[in-house]
Amino acid sequence: MRRPKKYEAGEATQYISRRAALRKLQLSLNDFRRLCILKGVYPREPKHRRRAQKGSSDIKILYHAKDIRFLLHEPIVWTLRDYKIFAKKSGRDRAIKDFRNLKRRLAMFPEIKLDHIVKERYPTFIDALKDLDDCLTLLFLFSTFPSLHLIPREQSNLCRRLTIEFLHYVIASKSLRKVFISIKGYYFQAEIKGQKVTWIVPHYYPFKPQSRQEVDFKVMSIFVEFYTIMLGFTNFRLYHGLNLAYPPQFPSNMLQDNADTLKDESSFVSDRITALNFELLRTDKVQEDEEEPDIDMELLEQDGDSKRIIKMKQEAQEVSRLRTLFKGLKFFINREVPREPLVIIIRSFGGKVSWDSSVFSGATYDESDETITHQIVDRPSLSTQYISRDYIQPQWIFDCVNQRQLLPTNKYFLGEPLPPHLSPFVDAKRDTYIPPEEKALHDPSLIETHAQSEDESEDDAAAEEEDTVEQELLDAQLQRAYQQETAEYKKYGGADGVNEDEEDSDEEDFDGEEQESDDDDEEELDEKEKRLLEEKQKMSVQSGKVHKVNKRQVHKAEVDEHRLQARMVKPRHRNLFRKLIREKQAKEKEEWLLRKKRRTIETDAKEAKKLAKREARKAAAAAAAAAAQLGAK
């Protein structure tokens, strides 16, 4: 039996460098990157890098050898090789000015088909839904881009159409569950086939070209090329599940490029929002709201876990109420408010929405409609207002959805300071720091106690100030009375005309008599009473001692326990253990910073309230003094 040589087996044969992979596949670096993105192959980190690199200490990009062998059988590799042949032949025809042959070659341009790759990477429909988050986020981003050097106009148009089709499905199925506004954009979460899909719609800003190439649009464009095929398959399956015609039929003037949309970016976005306010065509000719089936408790309680079943039923009832949260309400959006996220939310929960038809197309009713219940405004005041509707700020829509109920509108009126906008994506079990407003969503009594403590602290501060003022007045009055008494003593020899020496002698005689009477009483005590007193003293309860916790010893014990825990970790798990410790320390630091920020904000707010109250009291005192002076005159 031949003895195996070094690096002929084991980890050295499991990995292959990128240069060796390029040599094996006979592809350029750009084509190899494109192939890896489309097939989902990515670099790997070996456990022992020196063994994987066959003794080399240089840091190389390594792939699994089985992944590279997997790429050898991919039909796209031949298409990528055909690109080289096409480029050479078309360049030759262009050089010799053989335009007839060049036109024939352009008509035979090799196209990459990605259908089989989508089916290969996602064997089931649920697998595709699980990987839909990044797909939607990237396509929504590219749908806002204009035509760039590496991003053709056709690609951004395709992204725009596919994202609108997906939003129409979310609106028709009423599967939206959570929304949130952040600096990055608008977060949306929908529940589709039991899977939670979360994506970001970016804020709309005019595109500003970058002077430096900090973002690799070419690589991102390859991802978009794959995700468009994937989302097309997904939309087709989702639409047919709701008996909706696919592709959806929009009016002829929507989602089509003309001279205006290519030049004006605002009209480019306006057409997209107009399509969202348009009803889709169904294949079954039935326009009825789909209701979720009721849960039969009698059948489910046979499992024995009744608490879990009751919780499931409560969750289902909340979701059914959430699906019709804005049913029967009509909204009107002012021109300064971003329309796209509000149209998605309002229509997803059964409401009707419109805007100014003179500025944007697609409006269904005017501002003068008396049946409008809410008008969404983002300005401090309005010149004309209707009594029959509520004028609210946009945050009211998002907070109502997250709390799954219609909130009072008095905190969201024009010019009112808005309450904190809380994230619905907080996990109470994993996140250590939870603000008091977030806790109040689950337990409303906590916010009441928090408000009461703030009011009590303010009342205590005000009471202390009032006590100090009253104490100063009493001290002044007592000082004045003492001065008057001393003046009378000096003038008349005492308050009642009696000398002080006579009073002192009388007091001494009275004290002597009291001492004699006390001695007689002590002698009259019987022995029985003395015994009772002694027994009572023996029966007295001794005061306990407070056990003080030594924080230094507790901290030392925790550190020793942590060191012992670190020693017990196996060597192969030490990196994972250190990673967990770093994550724990980062969370603790983040929690500490959030609590510190919260304390500073609360102290600043309290100081501002105290200062305002002091100023109000000073103003009231000055007004009272001025009124008293006028009355005296």
Swiss-Prot record:
Residue ranges, compositional bias (Basic and acidic residues): 527-538, 555-564
Organism phylogeny: Eukaryota, Metazoa, Ecdysozoa, Arthropoda, Hexapoda
Residues carrying Phosphoserine: S453, S457
Entry annotated with the keyword Transport: no
Positions in coiled-coil regions: 593-626
Positions of disulphide bridges: none
Subcellular localization(s) per the UniProt record: Nucleus, Nucleolus; Nucleus, Nucleoplasm
CDD domains attached to this UniProt entry: BRCT_pescadillo_like
Classification via InterPro entries: BRCT_dom (IPR001357), BRCT_dom_sf (IPR036420), PES (IPR010613)
Protein family per UniProt: Belongs to the pescadillo family.
Disordered: region residues: 450-470, 490-567
Main location per the UniProt record: nucleus
Alphabetical UniProt keywords: Coiled coil, Nucleus, Phosphoprotein, Ribosome biogenesis, rRNA processing
Annotated organism of origin: Drosophila virilis
A GO BP entry: maturation of 5.8S rRNA from tricistronic rRNA transcript (SSU-rRNA, 5.8S rRNA, LSU-rRNA)
Biased composition range(s): Basic residues: 545-554
This protein's GO CC annotations: nucleolus; nucleoplasm; PeBoW complex; preribosome, large subunit precursor
Reported function: Required for maturation of ribosomal RNAs and formation of the large ribosomal subunit.
Pfam family, one: Pescadillo_N
Compositional bias (Acidic residues): 454-470, 498-526
Name of the protein described by the UniProt record: Pescadillo homolog
Keyword Phosphoprotein applies: yes
Ranges for domain BRCT: 321-414
Molecular function terms from GO: ribonucleoprotein complex binding; RNA binding
